[in-house]
C-alpha cells in the first residue's frame, strides 16, 4: 500500500511515510509547529503540480479551512502562472491564505528574508523543493526543511504541525 512520504531534515535520505512523521518528529525533538510551507520554484511547480494542490485547497475552502501557517506558492514560469490564474487555481490557493510569489528561484535558493524567525532559532518548514540542506532556504542553519509533494505541503499547511497526519486526522 502506498502512502505519501516526507523527507528530511537536511537530507533526502531521511524518508518516512506521513503516518510515521509524528513519532519521528517527537523522537528527534524537531520543532513540531511548522513555521512556513512552500510550493514551487522549478520543482513541483508545473500546471499539473499546482493544479493538484489547488484542488485540495478548493476542497478545504468549501469547509472554511485556512492554512495555519504562511503558505507561499512559486509558479514554475510566467506561462504556468497565467494558466493557473486563468483556470482559477490561484484563486483556490489564495482562498486558504496562500501568497503567490514571483516566478523565480526565491526561497529555494535562499532569497528569502524572514522576519518571523531569528537567526539561529530552530524551526521547521515544509516544501516541495528538491533541496533541503542546512541554510538552503532562509540562510538559517537551524531551519529544519522537510520535503513533500505539493499535495502533502498543502495538507501539512492546513494542519500546521508535523504531527498532523492528513490521511487520518481531521480539521475543524
PLM regions with names:
Residues 1-172:
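Fe-S-dependent hydro-lyases/dehydratases of central metabolism
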Amino acid at each position: 500500500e502506498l502512502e505519501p512520504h516526507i523527507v528530511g531534515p537536511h537530507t533526502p535520505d531521511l524518508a518516512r511515510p506521513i503516518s510515521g512523521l509524528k513519532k519521528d518528529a517527537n523522537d528527534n525533538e524537531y520543532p513540531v509547529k511548522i513555521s512556513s510551507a512552500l510550493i514551487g520554484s522549478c520543482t513541483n511547480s508545473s500546471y499539473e503540480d499546482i493544479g493538484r494542490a489547488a484542488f485540495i485547497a478548493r476542497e478545504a475552502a468549501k469547509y472554511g479551512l485556512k492554512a495555519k501557517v504562511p503558505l507561499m506558492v512559486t509558479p514554475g514560469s510566467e506561462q504556468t502562472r497565467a494558466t493557473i490564474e486563468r483556470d482559477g487555481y490561484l484563486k483556490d490557493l489564495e482562498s486558504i491564505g496562500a501568497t503567490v510569489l514571483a516566478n523565480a528561484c526565491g526561497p529555494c535558493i535562499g532569497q528569502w528574508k524572514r522576519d518571523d524567525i531569528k537567526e539561529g532559532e530552530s524551526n521547521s518548514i515544509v516544501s516541495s523543493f528538491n533541496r533541503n540542506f542546512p541554510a538552503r532556504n532562509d540562510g538559517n542553519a537551524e531551519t529544519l526543511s522537510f520535503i513533500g509533494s505539493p499535495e502533502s505541503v498543502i495538507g501539512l499547511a492546513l494542519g500546521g504541525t508535523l504531527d498532523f497526519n492528513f490521511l487520518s486526522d481531521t480539521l475543524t
